[in-house]
Amino acid sequence: MAGETTKLDLSVKAIGWGAADASGVLQPIRFYRRAPGERDVKIRVLYCGVCNFDMEMVRNKWGFTRYPYVFGHETAGEVVEVGKKVEKFKVGDKVGVGCMVGSCGKCFHCQNEMENYCPEPNLADGSTYREEGERSYGGCSNVMVVDEKFVLRWPENLPQDKGVPLLCAGVVVYSPMKYMGFDKPGKHIGVFGLGGLGSIAVKFIKAFGGKATVISTSRRKEKEAIEEHGADAFVVNTDSEQLKALEGTMDGVVDTTPGGRTPMPLMLNLVKFDGAVILVGAPETLFELPLEPMGRKKIIGSSTGGLKEYQEVLDIAAKHNIVCDTEVIGIDYLSTAMERIKNLDVKYRFAIDIGNTLKFEE
């Protein structure tokens, strides 16, 4: 009859790890996902990444976490079931899921492959609800059911345990660099910070055929930046002489420092006319701009990427052998891992071995 709503079939039993409240205490959480629809893909989760965003969401830092909360916006696994109208995947395929599991599909952003800017997104990690009334729980769980449009093809030669952080750190740095044209050969890009975001930014810059200069607070990271990640140069951000010599030489800089602590005038001074400062380190306070003219330089931010960009990140990583430095952990180590993230004690990202350590029992 007109006006009636179809009751959603929430019959897929699932177990995940998350929080029941803002105390931050992590625990197993049982819940139900919807039965696969015609265009849905059912995924056995094998790996799930953990980052600072997850830690802050667990503690409701921004005030919009809905409990019980199962985190996870960097998820990799294999297809175990497909709906009858699914065209992109078959059982056994390796796949990934990023931060989005749905969007309106009608707005300007959705129509232009920028689903991440949709005003009505369905996020993977439990911060939103579907139109039908289904709660979305994150990928730190044994199973996911996702519309095939929001499922990513996983390249065969990209290890899932080393690649799963690309679904966060990778797309966060790739999307704005591509937008600014920094994916072209010959660009000189400065990277502030050499953590999870910075290390991936350097690898992508080199894959693009560019020159990467790492600017860090610690001289101890010089060997690591050059020998492990392929940076062309390294500068300590307190070395005024070196910084002076670099003024106006860079096509852009990417600030990946936690909390966006790098002074804006310092970054603007390094950038050429028409260059750009890209902020991906989630600034926690307002930044100050210099009063003098900025030479038509741009300051931009980033909010992950669209689905096309997500797939490009995985494909480029596979083509250029880009992997993340991950510490693979079991689910029982998760609380310790969150504390280590809080204390900046991880090199560089955690990947949870969901497939072998998260057991589902009826």
UniProtKB/Swiss-Prot annotation:
Residues that bind substrate: 73
The entry's free-text remark on the cofactor is: Binds 2 Zn(2+) ions per subunit.
User: What EC number(s) would the UniProt record show?
Assistant: 1.3.1.-
Q: Tell me which residues bind Zn(2+) 2.
A: 104, 107, 110, 118
Record-level Gene Ontology MF annotations = oxidoreductase activity, acting on the CH-OH group of donors, NAD or NADP as acceptor; zinc ion binding
Cofactor(s) in the UniProt record: Zn(2+)
- What is the protein name for this chain? Alcohol dehydrogenase 13
What is the protein's species of origin? Catharanthus roseus
